[in-house]
């Protein structure tokens, strides 16, 4: 599989994760605070989004140069390696506010990639 197909697949995976993120966030902060499964799901989302951000920046550092990609990767590293220090308020903010900001970046990258192919 060539690099372009891998990138397309990773962007598709990221779209799916962002949809799942949106669905979980819609449950609300009160559910997040009372359902012990939701913070764990948020940690898993941070892990997966950050892992994809790492793959995308490694595959094409010029296209995936926006600092939000590296922030997602660093968040992943923190959540995975410092899980005992994860602050629930910061985790909520990250999944509620920061991760959704990747969606317009994905749309912009897709427009750019379609233009480059045409």
Write out the residue ranges for each language-model feature:
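Solvent-exposed interaction patches of small proteins and small membrane subunits
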Residues: 1-118
């Amino acid at each position: 599989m060539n690099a372009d197909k891998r990138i397309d697949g990773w962007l598709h995976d990221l779209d799916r994760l962002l949809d799942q993120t949106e669905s979980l966030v819609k449950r609300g902060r009160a559910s997040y605070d009372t359902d012990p499964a939701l913070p764990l799901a948020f940690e898993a989302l941070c892990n997966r989004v950050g892992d994809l951000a790492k793959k995308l920046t490694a595959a094409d550092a010029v296209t995936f140069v926006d600092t939000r990609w590296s922030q997602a990767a660093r968040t992943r590293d923190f959540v995975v390696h410092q899980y005992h220090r994860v602050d629930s308020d910061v985790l909520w903010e990250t999944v509620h506010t920061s991760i959704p900001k990747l969606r317009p970046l994905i749309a912009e990258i897709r427009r750019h990639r379609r233009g480059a192919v045409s």
